[in-house]
């Protein structure tokens, strides 16, 4: 059986990667989207932009409720926050978007490949080889073009280590209890 050669392989399924994959699929290119995590969407969808905006909306709504009496709305003085419900809502929003990305990949005939992708070297005979490691097993795929859309990760300041008081975006967005106070360094 002849080896499959993709027109384009994209490493990383965050906003840059999935947008490139969708467009390539729409143009009729044989496309592979390689993602190291078990779900598509990258940092933005799972531990960045989307969950942050979901929590921000909750905070804005809470803030608006304090002025409810001015608008003739009564009975909100005894409002309570159910942090578990807030986190559940955030999780549902993220899951809905992740499912939507899977649908868009299928709709646009983009093949998703699970695993950690890396280029093995320069182009050979007009194709690149991408090594994909999943569950400690390596496979290889070939592509005429490769887009590196590997995204970002949290970086701690020198001398700081993540612990129960120093948190990255990943830990902060999955807190089981709402903190009484919080300082954010960086953006």
Language-model segments: residues:
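N-terminal Rossmann-fold NAD(P) dinucleotide-binding loop
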Residues: 17
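The conserved SAM/SAH-binding core of class I Rossmann-like methyltransferase domains
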Residues: 11, 34-35
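Short flexible/disordered coil segments
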Residues: 103, 184-187
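Glycine-rich flavin
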Residues: 2-6, 22-29, 35-178
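Beta1/beta-strand and adjacent pyrophosphate-binding region of the FAD-binding site
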Residues: 2-14, 180-185
């Amino acid at each position: 059986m002849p080896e499959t050669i993709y027109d384009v392989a994209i490493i990383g399924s965050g906003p840059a990667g999935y947008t490139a994959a969708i467009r390539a699929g729409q143009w009729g290119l044989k496309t592979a989207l390689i993602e190291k995590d078990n779900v598509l969407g990258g940092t933005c969808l799972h531990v960045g932009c989307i969950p942050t905006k979901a929590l921000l909306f909750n905070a804005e709504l809470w803030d608006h409720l304090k002025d409810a009496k001015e608008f003739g709305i009564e009975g909100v003085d005894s409002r309570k926050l159910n942090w578990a419900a807030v986190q559940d809502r955030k999780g549902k929003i993220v899951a809905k978007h992740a499912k939507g990305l899977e649908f868009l990949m299928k709709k646009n005939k983009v093949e998703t490949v699970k695993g950690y992708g890396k280029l093995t070297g320069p182009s050979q005979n007009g194709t690149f080889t991408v090594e994909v490691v999943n569950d400690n097993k390596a496979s290889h795929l070939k592509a005429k073009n490769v887009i590196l859309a590997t995204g970002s990760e949290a970086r701690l300041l020198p001398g700081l280590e993540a612990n129960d008081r120093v948190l990255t975006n990943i830990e902060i967005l999955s807190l089981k209890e709402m903190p009484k106070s919080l300082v954010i360094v960086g953006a």
